[in-house]
């Protein structure tokens, strides 16, 4: 299903998407097209993109083509999903140590829809960090890996 979503293949394209997406949540899925977990997430993203079109713009970003952002967001596990609103990086408290990105795939379409709605409402009120509406049992668990320390 990843062929249904637009792809950003360079740092310039990612920069342009961040700068030009206004009054919507920008969803950037970092990963690889052939990865099975990325394909699972892409299926959820593509099935919800039409329903969320007034609130969110969803793009796929290949980690191999954008090493600057892969390093900047410390993408050690794929897929990782990062959110922006009007050029501002939106953080979400998932009950995990990392609030900058969602790592892994969402369990259900509704989890993703709920998260986008919460980010959108919070961003419209000027918040830069919001509380995740996703049940903690549905948030993938992982250990933070600090590189080059």
From Swiss-Prot:
Q: Does the keyword Cell cycle apply?
A: yes
Record keywords: Cell cycle, mRNA processing, mRNA splicing, Nucleus
InterPro entries, per this entry?
Answer: Dim1 (IPR004123), Thioredoxin-like_sf (IPR036249)
Q: Which GO terms describe its biological process?
A: mRNA splicing, via spliceosome; positive regulation of cell population proliferation
GO CC terms, sorted: cytosol; nucleoplasm; nucleus; U4/U6 x U5 tri-snRNP complex
Q: In which compartments does the protein localize? A: Nucleus
**Assembly and partners?**
Homodimer. Interacts with the U5-102 kDa protein subunit of the spliceosome.
**UniProt function note:** Essential role in pre-mRNA splicing. Required in cell cycle progression for S/G(2) transition.
Family according to the record: Belongs to the DIM1 family.
Question: What is the name listed in the Swiss-Prot or TrEMBL entry for this protein?
Answer: Thioredoxin-like protein 4B
Which gene specifies this protein's sequence?
Txnl4b
């Amino acid at each position: 299903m990843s062929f249904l979503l637009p792809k950003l293949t360079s740092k310039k394209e990612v920069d342009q998407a961040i700068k030009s997406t206004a009054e919507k949540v920008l969803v950037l899925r970092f990963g690889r097209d052939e990865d099975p977990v990325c394909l699972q997430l892409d299926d959820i993203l593509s099935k919800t993109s039409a329903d969320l079109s007034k609130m969110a713009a969803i793009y796929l970003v290949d980690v191999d083509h954008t090493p600057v952002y892969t390093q900047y967001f410390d993408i050690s596990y794929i897929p990782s999903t990062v959110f922006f609103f009007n050029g501002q990086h939106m953080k979400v408290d998932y009950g995990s140590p990392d609030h900058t990105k969602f790592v892994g795939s969402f369990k259900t379409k509704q989890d993703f829809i709920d998260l986008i709605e919460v980010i959108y409402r919070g961003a419209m009120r000027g918040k830069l960090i919001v509380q995740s509406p996703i049940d903690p049992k549905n948030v993938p668990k992982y250990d933070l890996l600090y590189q080059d320390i």
